[in-house]
Amino acid sequence: MGKRIDFYNDPDAPAPNSLVPSVNVVVTNADGDLLMIRRTDNDNWAVPGGAIDLGESIPAAAVRETLEETGITCHITGLVGTYSDPRHVVLYTSNGEARQEFSIVLVGRAVAGSPTPSDESREVLWVPRGEVAALRMDRSMRMRIEHYLAGRAEPYIG
């Protein structure tokens, strides 16, 4: 399996050769814990998410990706923001794709299922809000989660 390498404002980053609309979902349970995955491609922690398929709505992609990566079915309840910083490039070593960041981050509530790892998630855990900051994650993911935890009145647009 290839690796995922995130570059931020790095002069040595590869030039982007793709832009793929994607979703991430900050899913919470009844206790307010966040659903977190430890990714198989870079060993970092993240909220679930992935590419939006042709013919699929944003909420449908979010629900599908969450279920595929975690075993949890969620209901989408809100929007954290949009993240499209051209200085953030993600290199996938398996195929040479250098993707410019483009992600819509939603809020979801867990409605069914049990945390179950997949081929994209080494671990799936409910993490108390106060413990999320201690997890290793890339800068962009940390910012997305911090925006959610801050309870911003308006979605982030950037």
Predicted regions and their residues:
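Acidic, metal-coordinating catalytic segment for phosphate/diphosphate chemistry
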Residues: 1-24, 96
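Short connector loops at helix/strand junctions that flank enzyme active sites
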Residues: 20, 40-42, 47, 74, ...
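Short, well-ordered beta-strand micro-motif
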Residues: 27, 105-109, 126
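Conserved Nudix-box catalytic region and its N-terminal flanking loop in Nudix hydrolases
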Residues: 29, 33-72
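Nudix hydrolase/Nudix homology domain
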Residues: 43-44, 115-158
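A short coil-to-beta-strand element that immediately follows conserved catalytic motifs
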Residues: 73-83
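Active-site-adjacent beta-strand/loop module that shapes the phosphate/pyrophosphate-binding cleft
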Residues: 85-114
